[in-house]
UniProtKB/Swiss-Prot annotation:
Belongs to the UPF0231 family. This is UPF0231 protein ESA_03214. It comes from Cronobacter sakazakii (strain ATCC BAA-894). It holds the Pfam family UPF0231. InterPro entries: UPF0231.
């Protein structure tokens, strides 16, 4: 999973992730927005569920993050509809609306984000 951090013309830090992980970048950009307390909460939850069958979720304004001991999923809240409601030819999986990755990979991105903010924030 490749990622990069950018500062836009207004000084806001933006996160971009590789294809298939775009929703994770959107989660950082829409939900985190430099809120290190939210990252603290997510990291603590990752430690709590590690090695267990438990799951944890954090619902935001635009995206919801789920995690268990092995995997992290970020999904756009707008995807909360049943298959019957989908238009013909539409797929539930939209690369920019749903991302899955391993917990360790996710935590590496979180740490890199923190490091970027500390250096350039």
């Amino acid at each position: 999973m490749d990622y990069e951090f950018l500062r836009d013309i207004t000084g806001v830090v933006k996160v971009r992730l590789s294809m298939g992980h775009e929703a994770l970048g959107h989660w950082f950009n829409e939900e985190v927005k430099g809120n290190l307390a939210l990252l603290d909460e997510v990291e603590a939850a990752a430690r709590d569920v590690k090695g267990s069958e438990r799951q944890w979720q954090k619902t935001g304004h635009e995206y919801t993050l789920w995690l268990d001991g092995e995997e992290v999923m970020v999904r756009a809240n707008q995807l909360e509809f049943s298959g019957d409601e989908m238009e013909e030819g539409m797929s539930y999986y939209d690369e920019e609306s749903l991302s899955l990755c391993g917990v360790e990979d996710f935590l590496q991105v979180v740490q890199a984000y923190r490091d970027f903010l500390a250096q350039y924030g």
